[in-house]
């Protein structure tokens, strides 16, 4: 609990420094608190980036954390800066993704409203994530759908 109180009392720069320089093992309560911060509209985008890096460093093997990061991307993309979401997609490289994750990411990329938003950096990060995590062809079916969209075709390397 000491880390949560200390964290809350810091300004944005202090929070980023604390997360970047953190040594030791953070408490479960602190990690859970940080996960909640990802969905707050009051948290600065640069702080969210440090939270994402922190979580991928200390919780890369936690399914619930991975699910929350995927949720941040696919359900909260309208409420967050593209930079934050692109970093979230990049940090997912450190987590194990399953078929459901591939489906959610693919569905977002196929969504017409999302495509009209022209989020180039996020789209590139998501396609790179799918390509990198495509071990054993587990996401080939999603690539077939995505290849039908002209703007995605060149980015997809099967």
Residue ranges and their predicted role:
Residues 1, 52, 56, 73, ...:
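Charge-rich, low-complexity amphipathic helices
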Residues 1-6, 25-39, 60-76, 98-111, ...:
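Amphipathic alpha-helical scaffolding segments comprising HEAT/armadillo-like alpha-solenoid repeats
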Residues 13-25, 46-63, 83-97, 117-135, ...:
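Structural detector for internal amphipathic alpha-helices that build alpha-solenoid repeat scaffolds
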Residues 31, 124-126, 143, 149, ...:
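Generic L/I/V-rich hydrophobic alpha-helical segments across diverse proteins
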Residues 5-13, 39-44, 75-83, 111-118, ...:
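Short coil turns that connect the paired helices of HEAT/ARM alpha-solenoid repeats
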